[in-house]
Amino acid sequence: MNQEVMNLFNGQVPAQNFDSIRISIASPEKILSWSYGEIKKPETINYRTFKPERDGLFCARIFGPIKDYECLCGKYKRMKYKGIICEKCGVEVTLSRVRRERMGHIELAAPVAHIWFLKSLPSRISTLLDMTLKDVERVLYFENYIVTEPGLTALKEHQLLTEEEYMLAVDEYGEDQFTAMIGAEAIYEMLASMNLEKIAGDLRSELADTTSDLKQKKLMKRLKIVENFMESGNRPEWMIMKVVPVIPPDLRPLVPLDGGRFATSDLNDLYRRVINRNNRLKRLIELRAPGIIIRNEKRMLQESVDALFDNGRRGRVITGANKRPLKSLSDMLKGKQGRFRQNLLGKRVDYSGRSVIVTGPELKLHQCGLPKKMALELFKPFIYARLDAKGYSSTVKQAKKLVEKEKPEVWDILDEVIREHPVLLNRAPTLHRLGIQAFEPTLVEGKAIQLHPLVCTAFNADFDGDQMAVHVPLSLEAQLEARVLMMSTNNILHPANGAPIIVPSQDMVLGLYYLSILNQNEPGEGMAFSDLGELHHALESKVVTLHTKIRGRFKSVDEDGKPYSKIYETTPGRLLIGELLPKNGKVPFDICNQEMTKKNISKMIDTVYRHCGQKDTVIFCDRIMQLGFSHACRAGISFGKDDMVIPATKAKIVADTENLVKEYEQQYNDGLITQGEKYNKVVDAWGKATEKVAEEMMARIKAVEFDENTGRQKPMNSIYMMSHSGARGSPNQMRQLGGMRGLMAKPSGEIIETPIISNFKEGLTVNEYFNSTHGARKGLADTALKTANSGYLTRRLVDVAQDCIVTHVDCGTETGLTMTAIVDAGQVVASLGARILGRTALDDIDHPVTGERIVDAGKMILEPDVIEIEKAGIQSIRIRSALTCEIQTGVCSVCYGRDLARGTPVNMGEAVGVIAAQSIGEPGTQLTMRTFHLGGTATVVDQSFLEASYEGTVQIKNRNVLRNSEGSLVAMGRNMTVQILDERGVERSSQRVAYGSKLHVDEGDKVKRGQRLAEWDPYTRPMMTEVAGTVQFEDLVDGLSVLEATDESTGITKRQVIDWRSTPRGSDLKPAIVIKDASGNVAKLSRGGDARFLLSVDAILSVEPGTKVSQGDVLARSPLESAKTKDITGGLPRVAELFEARRPKDHAIIAEIDGTIRLGRDYKNKRRVIIEPAEDGVEPVEYLIPKGKPFHLQDGDYIEKGDYILDGNPAPHDILAIKGVEALASYLVNEIQEVYRLQGVVINDKHIEVIVRQMLQKVEITDAGDSTYIVGDNVDRIELEDVNDHLIEQGKKPASGEPVLLGITKASLQTPSFISAASFQETTKVLTEAAIAGKTDGLQGLKENVIVGRLIPAGTGGTMTQIRRIATSRDELILEERRKGTGAAVATPMLQDMAENAPAAE
């Protein structure tokens, strides 16, 4: 009853519950049904009385009263007249709030086209009428007539006529023989008279007959629009408006400013123009004005309505008085400031404050310090309530006074109020979910918020003036969620990689590292201590130091809780750390009996978390932080200039390198090497020199020295301690301080040949300083640009993945991905164990030798299992993946695996898509902010050999080798791999060997670890002959296809192939080297082809005509690209390029089938390469390759499906089409990971897999079967499955399709939810498409639900959604039973059944 009374006062309609939102085109009747009256005058308000004009844009009669419950003339005031319509002024007595809801309309004197359907490409109106957009515009803007009904005349339907042609036609045929119209009326007639069913039928039959691709595409576009209209029930003529709706006046307010001026919304100006022109047109029609005047007025009306809906879309932009373009209705929705992103997705919050942060080292991990002033303000309502309850005040007014005067009892009550009431702290930019965490407030004096030092990493906060915002969760549910889910103690692990994020940093690490150092010859060395008490005593009395080597008894408890003790060789410092370990025997002392670098501390915290749980970890972290700080303070580590050690050998290394560079210069002058090769070698030489100086410096700094007098070990170099412990600084920075700065990069990314030999301690010369400014400035410029880029990448990722939620426990799929260790240049960069930890095994994993079971199929692979798997030497494991999950919406828990931030299997309702997007996007921003730390120092040492990473026996796959004239083995195969097998015959490593490499081992050889297997020249790619004979040149014409450069000083000539197609004379040449046999004929290769080797541009000839060559000799060399520095600059755009699935500029060409290469007849500037298939019944495939691109295959080479015919970056679409989803996934994951790995950022593969899954949601129809699809349609995978199920049920032929890879932007725009797509990008286009198709948004994702103001269907909101879903399905069941008339008796067992099968809400 109370609620009803309240509603009576508030005039509120209770909120409606709805499950979906539909959008369609408004018919004129619909617009009139919304409207409360027609607006006839352009007037707004009377400037003297400030009252709205009647029938004007703010009319109170149409839109409602200005003041609550008061009519305009003031005859009726107060609640008691509610609902009465005043007879004098015609205003209904009600709330003024209705002025935000009630709409009006304008009856147009002539129809006008809706600009969205006309100009939003592709134009819907012109596609539907099958005319060009230009022609439609000519008709609409009164330039041409159009023939709508030719009758018996020679005119054609839809023919355009100019004014003169129309007059002539009227004269010729008479006015009633044909109909030609002009303006929107004409288009309206044409659209209204369309028979959509007939058109659709005609288009389908035409599609079946046509063969031309272009025509098919055009017909498909039209058919799609026609079908959209048919399915949605929209009529085509509704795209032409006869009535314009007017939005409520309070949404386009008019505010009086002081001084008698008004501030108004632009919409009022735009509406005013429409009304003025419309009224003028009405008057002209009444006056029977000449046609030309009326037509002009109609055109102007059309333009003003265009401007109202989308200003600037057509013609010139309409500007206001101050030359500013007016904001139209479309602009209200678009972009960052539009309705979607500004108001619906980005709302402001009350109960919040912000202030500067300072460090609070005495806080517990779950606490933060809140300034008293701030707390008083934030918790006011709670304080008022408590004051009232305790009887300090009887009214809110009294309570207010007490609080304002800051009476002592207020502070006591504030203490009570904030106890156990968590607050949220947020630091902008919030790049991942750890940017907002909950803490329990403790009151502090002053005005700064105190933050616990350990959570700084998560917030990326420091105390140089950062500010943070505080928010108060008000409702009980909000407080509960803050405490249970967001408390800082619950966020110990990083969601991106599962490593601890609450890890000591900087001073704390330094303190712990200092504690754990072991020095030789310290006082008391070799003493033994029975317990920690004794040890403390000895430390106090200075019998031992923290670093003395001692033997100590460490007491702990075993698994059963029985105390035991063990003696360790250790130091007092390490025992102090061990003292803090949780006393439950699960974490052994060994973990802190080592040097405590940041990595080791992180490992220690991780072990404690996995074995002892969250509570112990939090207590341990707090204690370890206190210990670290206190010992960093006591150690007093600082550094002076002498700590930067310059190695004595530096001068010699530099001198040697300078001589080497001179030698290269000489070789270049002698014509032995090219400019490019010289550049590469010089850069390489300096790169190696820098490394060498750095190594010497590190060796010097690391060296252990002893004091001559006391024999004690001297204290360590403090710079080395800082860097080595991971507290601050990196070896790279140390190298610049004490070694040599090394090579610098130009802004273009090329490396400057002259390095910076000085370091910062010696000081730079002017030239060196100038060279280094490039890098420094580039760093700063990059940072500014990349922050925006990275933010945009994150936004696209979130948008594409926002509806990916864990919805089921297990999908039961049989498919998955194969995981192997990632090896790069012989180094294992990501071990198999690291990649499979926390994933679900697809098959049973057994030990390859003993056959004993390690992990069952469908079980999660945990830390102990990983150790077993690595021990067993298993090379590859199949795991479940989000990519292959078969759930229709979202993913299942088993495919996803472990929730990285909790270390447990992932919960139902976890928003894994958003977490994945944040995990990938967050380091993007981080990296961009970190580019300039190295000051642009270039790092380049090219790899030129293969080493064995394991011991074992060599096996060569696809072996194809020759011995050359020097007697060494040379690799002649294009895809040879060298594998190493261990004694059990299990493959331990497998590496590809480049063509032309020298092999040091052969099949069956035994190798030791680190032994050289093969080496090659990293700067050139050789072309070698496999037959012996005499060289002859073909088409190598001086000046046309080859340039001969002679060096005057040495007389040595070298020949380089130049681009022969740049001159008309050279266009038919095919420069090649031919090998003739003894009888003068062209020698034959082993595969049967001729020994003719085609040369590519820039190849340098190594032989002369007539030279005798033997097998494996080099004929020519092609130089490779010069080294550019890699830093994330190449990185961020690279990641974006991969996620956007763009085709790289010079992309690789991939073989689609296995077979033999044949070179066909060449075109003018393309080379034809044909693959003759190896198996029967397969058509040969032909590729066109631009001439002059380095092409390394010869006629008759055997090639496998998926091999590269032309090198380069492959296009991801090709990988998907040729090798399938799994290959695509592994390519994308590896490429993206490589970029992040370069920066030392660890991201779990599963995050990238989730995004790739979202990119693969669409299928291109290859065979329509009996469905209504058209071949080439892009449909949702889920939709296709549903349609096919129906078709199979009816015994019809299902449609089939190929998966398509969409870039993240495209995928976001093609999401089934139009609300989500519209709020992302291209708002008008998305809404236009959705309206025509009459789309329904099922509100599945997070974004849509935020926009309509509901709980998101993830987390706690997901449970509610689930409960609602189960409830409705039960209701339906009962209703169904009732209908059948079996009564409710049968319904109960079914419900029982449903309750058991319902997914558990976790």
UniProtKB/Swiss-Prot annotation:
Binding site for Mg(2+): 462, 464, 466
One Pfam short name: RNA_pol_Rpb1_3
Keywords, ordered alphabetically: DNA-directed RNA polymerase, Magnesium, Metal-binding, Nucleotidyltransferase, Transcription, Transferase, Zinc
Cofactors demanded by this protein: Mg(2+); Zn(2+)
One MF term in the entry's GO annotations: zinc ion binding
Swiss-Prot/TrEMBL GO biological process terms: DNA-templated transcription
Matching SUPFAM superfamilies: beta and beta-prime subunits of DNA dependent RNA-polymerase
Binding site for Zn(2+) 1: 71, 73, 86, 89
Domain of life per record: Bacteria
CDD domains with a match to the protein in the record: RNAP_beta'_C, RNAP_beta'_N
Binding positions for Zn(2+) 2 per the UniProt entry: 811, 885, 892, 895
EC annotation from Swiss-Prot or TrEMBL: 2.7.7.6
Cofactor binding mode and count: Binds 1 Mg(2+) ion per subunit. Binds 2 Zn(2+) ions per subunit.
Transmembrane segments: none
GO cellular component terms, A-Z: DNA-directed RNA polymerase complex
Function (record text): DNA-dependent RNA polymerase catalyzes the transcription of DNA into RNA using the four ribonucleoside triphosphates as substrates.
Entry protein name: DNA-directed RNA polymerase subunit beta'
Species of the source: Rhizobium etli (strain ATCC 51251 / DSM 11541 / JCM 21823 / NBRC 15573 / CFN 42)
Name of encoding gene: rpoC
